[in-house]
From Swiss-Prot:
Substrate binds at M41, G193. It catalyses: 5-(2-hydroxyethyl)-4-methylthiazole + ATP = 4-methyl-5-(2-phosphooxyethyl)-thiazole + ADP + H(+). ATP binds at K116, T166. It is an enzyme of class 2 (transferase). One of its GO terms (molecular function) is magnesium ion binding. Its cofactor is Mg(2+). This is Hydroxyethylthiazole kinase 2. Belongs to the Thz kinase family. Pfam families: HK. InterPro entries: Hyethyz_kinase (IPR000417), Ribokinase-like (IPR029056). Its EC number is 2.7.1.50. The gene is thiM2. Keywords: ATP-binding, Kinase, Magnesium, Metal-binding, Nucleotide-binding, Thiamine biosynthesis, Transferase.
Amino acid sequence: MQEFTNPFPIGSSSLIHCMTNEISCEMLANGILALGCKPVMADDPREVLDFTKQSQALFINLGHLSAEKEKAIRIAASYAAQVCLPMVVDAVGVTASSIRKSLVRDLLDYRPTVLKGNMSEIRSLVGLKHHGVGVDASAKDQETEDLLQVLKDWCQTYHGMSFLVTGPKDLVVSKNQVAVLGNGCAELDWITGTGDLVGALTAVFLSQGKTGFEASCLAVSYLNIAAEKIVVQGMGLEEFRYQVLNQLSLLRRDENWLDTIKGEVYE
């Protein structure tokens, strides 16, 4: 798509601080390395500030929350807001947990660059009817007409923030633009951690100076296109998971990968 510029080669090996869960941390670390940056995962309140100060972007994922981790998240987010460090917040599980929803709404005061979630999570967060269960989106929540206007209003309230809403069609919404993106394959939903990986890749592109809108579009499209290249080969899920990381490192060598992004951008 002509709207975006190729982020590769990565200009500097940025340090990406991921506050994520134990299930997906290895995939995120390897995905960040595959793009040419460096990961760090620190969620102890006693040291989290030290690592955040050294980082070029912060990714907060609520996939495995505890009281101690919440304390660390608040410390890191507060610092990020003070120094304008690019920050991605992944609102995992807000459909099921009032604690998580309350935390995400508090984090909005720190003006994250990108707020990410699946369709049910984002509908729940902004006060729309939803049918999500646990951390999964519902097929009943894929209607976007009512959601888009609410998200635009939120972007006006939280100036500078973009929404990344994942689903069969991925939505990226900023104050002035909307992208509806169509790459991807069903197999990505069959292995754990791929949604978390999108958030981490968004942080990578933010560390390279991309806006929240562009970083979100690039991240979700990059992973989806990598997966499309694999699924045509036909393989089991464990091999598919391995090849996702493999393709992430290979796709960046393709100078024309942006041409394979499916979707539209609207002003």
